[in-house]
């Protein structure tokens, strides 16, 4: 059975750590912007109902992209924090006809290497879940907790530690309520699952590929370009 879904992509950040002349989602790989590659995986999916990209009000790059004229993709104003942008996206979806019980996927604009199999697994595993969940990867490396002097204070048990990735998938109404409540309470929200966690809801972890990397630093971009060169050679 198919699982219909909406998409929100917060894309108002400037990506300062990339030290580039434009936000990282507009850097090019293979002749196209990162955000175009990011959206491809979702726009190719037959169960997508529509998408909202949350952008800086004065964003000069988005209108130049072909995807900006796709009728399935709407634009919403991004906020100061990620949670503000996602809320604006949810409001835009409701204005477009989305219901409170509809599934919404939130995905990072600079995470363009999402495998279609991972997207499909997420949708299948969470289709009947009472809360929702997210793609994640079990931590593989040894973790150290540091003291104030930058010395090892403790080795952390990694057996139950996962890295949170995106997409993250929740019901529209529940996610909106959780984000609004957490923001009103001044709770730091780093991803959508943390907002649900603050509300006492436990999100399901769905294991995905480790190469679903978020492009944050120059070395991430170099890795992505090389990985796609190797991928294209094998086709």
Swiss-Prot record:
State if Ribonucleoprotein is listed as a keyword: no
Q: What class of enzyme is it?
A: transferase
Q: What is its EC number?
A: 2.7.7.60
Q: Which UniProt keywords apply?
A: Isoprene biosynthesis, Nucleotidyltransferase, Transferase
Site description Transition state stabilizer, residues in chain: 17, 24
- GO MF, any single term: 2-C-methyl-D-erythritol 4-phosphate cytidylyltransferase activity
Q: Which InterPro entries does the record cross-reference, listed alphabetically? A: IspD, IspD/TarI, IspD/TarI_cytidylyltransf_bact, ISPD_synthase_CS, Nucleotide-diphossugar_trans
Q: Could you tell me what reaction this enzyme catalyses?
A: 2-C-methyl-D-erythritol 4-phosphate + CTP + H(+) = 4-CDP-2-C-methyl-D-erythritol + diphosphate
Report if keyword Cell membrane is assigned: no
Concerning CDD domains, the annotation shows:
CDP-ME_synthetase
Which cysteine residues pair off into disulfide bonds? Answer: none
Q: In which pathway does it act?
A: Isoprenoid biosynthesis; isopentenyl diphosphate biosynthesis via DXP pathway; isopentenyl diphosphate from 1-deoxy-D-xylulose 5-phosphate: step 2/6
Give the positions of the site Positions MEP for the nucleophilic attack.
158, 214
Can you supply a Gene Ontology BP term from the record?
isopentenyl diphosphate biosynthetic process, methylerythritol 4-phosphate pathway
**Which family is annotated?**
Belongs to the IspD/TarI cytidylyltransferase family. IspD subfamily.
Q: What does this protein do?
A: Catalyzes the formation of 4-diphosphocytidyl-2-C-methyl-D-erythritol from CTP and 2-C-methyl-D-erythritol 4-phosphate (MEP).
This one is known as: 2-C-methyl-D-erythritol 4-phosphate cytidylyltransferase
The organism encoding this protein is Ectopseudomonas mendocina (strain ymp) (Pseudomonas mendocina)
Q: Which gene encodes it?
A: ispD
């Amino acid at each position: 059975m198919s699982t219909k879904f909406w998409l929100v992509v917060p894309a108002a950040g400037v990506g300062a750590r990339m030290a580039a002349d434009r936000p990282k989602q507009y850097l090019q790989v293979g002749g196209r912007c990162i955000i175009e590659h990011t959206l491809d995986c979702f726009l190719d999916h037959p169960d997508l109902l529509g998408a909202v990209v949350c952008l800086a009000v004065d964003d000069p790059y988005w209108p130049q992209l072909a995807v900006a004229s796709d009728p399935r993709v709407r634009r919403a104003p991004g906020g100061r924090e990620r949670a503000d942008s996602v809320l604006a996206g949810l409001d835009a979806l409701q204005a477009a006809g989305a219901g409170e019980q509809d599934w919404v996927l939130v995905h990072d604009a600079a995470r363009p290497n999402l495998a279609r199999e991972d997207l499909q697994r997420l949708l299948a595993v969470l289709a009947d879940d009472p809360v929702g969940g997210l793609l994640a990867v079990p931590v593989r490396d040894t973790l150290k907790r540091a003291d104030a002097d930058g010395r090892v204070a403790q080795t952390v048990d990694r057996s139950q530690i996962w890295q949170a990735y995106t997409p993250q998938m929740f019901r529209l109404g529940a996610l909106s309520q959780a984000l609004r409540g957490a923001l009103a309470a001044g709770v730091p929200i780093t991803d959508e699952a943390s907002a649900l966690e603050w509300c006492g809801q436990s999100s399901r972890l769905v294991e995905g590929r480790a190469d679903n990397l978020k492009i944050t630093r120059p070395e991430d971009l170099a890795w992505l370009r090389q990985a796609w060169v190797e991928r294209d050679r094998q086709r």
